[in-house]
Amino acid sequence: MYVLLANPRGFCAGVDRAIEIVKRAIETLGAPIYVRHEVVHNRFVVDDLKQRGAIFVEELDEVPDDATVIFSAHGVPQAVRQEAERRGLKVFDATCPLVTKVHFEVARHCRAGRDVVLIGHAGHPEVEGTMGQWSRERGPGTIYLVEDIEQVATLDVRQPENLAYTTQTTLSVDDTMGIIEALRARYPAMQGPRHDDICYATQNRQDAVRDLARQCDLVLVVGSPNSSNSNRLSELARRDGVESYLIDNASEIDPAWIVGKQHIGLTAGASAPQVLVDGVLARLRELGASGVSELEGEPESMVFALPKELRLRLVG
């Protein structure tokens, strides 16, 4: 049994930035620091930050007056920002800059009076944050959420000639392209973003897992069950005809999965740290893996700046 590692895998620039914001805020201002929603969707990361002094809450009414609060990488509705400002809370915004780009697109279309179709998963924090950029006070348009291609057939927008679309950043690239094509067929005048809203890391990890699936008879994806991008990786492998499982850590591996398998692929979602991948590798070696190699993949060098107040000051 041989293990192949996908490349790239694991943390993206937005996740790195969000986690570092929480760590630096605790170091700079002291605990506790409040974080609205899980800063990234990974249990290991959240538990580690809790031990450092982060307190995770779902809404701002759980945050005391005069406290510091961090918005998660998924972004927040405008109403949440306004509430934080009204209460005088100190805020650090860990929203991924690529999600912020989508927020700006929605706000721009809103001001222009357009209808907007958001392609995404209902209930996901990123979708809730993006939907929350819309305000009837800004313009006469309407925002619609479409989750799959079947919903396009029943979609009835108010302004078919004044329509734009945008997407959640962590979707399946193939599924999203299919939905966009169906929308364009139904609404030929629909506008789109200049560049795809699906982020570089999502695209790269999906390309990498497909490369992995072509060479393996089992693909393990390290990621938490509430991680959208991690779920998409496992789905893609299965869609390509390969058995695949999403696991939080090495303890979730069922030895029965690897019986008779010759090549096991291993990757990780954008919110899963390398330490969990290392743990899975160690467990696979215990179960008989004889070697490990890493596939070639798209190099990633993107880095997002931290808020000025949290940047390290160089002395000397």
Swiss-Prot record:
Keyword presence, Transcription: no
Residues given in the record as [4Fe-4S] cluster binding sites: 12, 96, 199
Cofactor(s) it depends on: [4Fe-4S] cluster
GO MF assignments: 4 iron, 4 sulfur cluster binding; 4-hydroxy-3-methylbut-2-enyl diphosphate reductase activity; metal ion binding
Active site feature: 126 (proton donor)
Pfam families (UniProt xref): LYTB
CDD domains: lytB_ispH
Binding locations of isopentenyl diphosphate: 41, 74, 124, 227-229, 271
Catalytic activity: isopentenyl diphosphate + 2 oxidized [2Fe-2S]-[ferredoxin] + H2O = (2E)-4-hydroxy-3-methylbut-2-enyl diphosphate + 2 reduced [2Fe-2S]-[ferredoxin] + 2 H(+); dimethylallyl diphosphate + 2 oxidized [2Fe-2S]-[ferredoxin] + H2O = (2E)-4-hydroxy-3-methylbut-2-enyl diphosphate + 2 reduced [2Fe-2S]-[ferredoxin] + 2 H(+)
EC number: 1.17.7.4
Keyword annotations of the record: 4Fe-4S, Iron, Iron-sulfur, Isoprene biosynthesis, Metal-binding, Oxidoreductase
Pathway: Isoprenoid biosynthesis; dimethylallyl diphosphate biosynthesis; dimethylallyl diphosphate from (2E)-4-hydroxy-3-methylbutenyl diphosphate: step 1/1; Isoprenoid biosynthesis; isopentenyl diphosphate biosynthesis via DXP pathway; isopentenyl diphosphate from 1-deoxy-D-xylulose 5-phosphate: step 6/6
A GO biological-process term: dimethylallyl diphosphate biosynthetic process
Record-listed (2E)-4-hydroxy-3-methylbut-2-enyl diphosphate binding positions: 41, 74, 124, 169, 227-229, 271
Residues at which dimethylallyl diphosphate binds: 41, 74, 124, 227-229, 271
CC cofactor note: Binds 1 [4Fe-4S] cluster per subunit.
Function: Catalyzes the conversion of 1-hydroxy-2-methyl-2-(E)-butenyl 4-diphosphate (HMBPP) into a mixture of isopentenyl diphosphate (IPP) and dimethylallyl diphosphate (DMAPP). Acts in the terminal step of the DOXP/MEP pathway for isoprenoid precursor biosynthesis.
Family label: Belongs to the IspH family.
PANTHER family attached to this UniProt entry: 4-HYDROXY-3-METHYLBUT-2-ENYL DIPHOSPHATE REDUCTASE
Protein name, as recorded: 4-hydroxy-3-methylbut-2-enyl diphosphate reductase
Natural source organism: Xanthomonas oryzae pv. oryzae (strain KACC10331 / KXO85)
Gene giving rise to this polypeptide: ispH
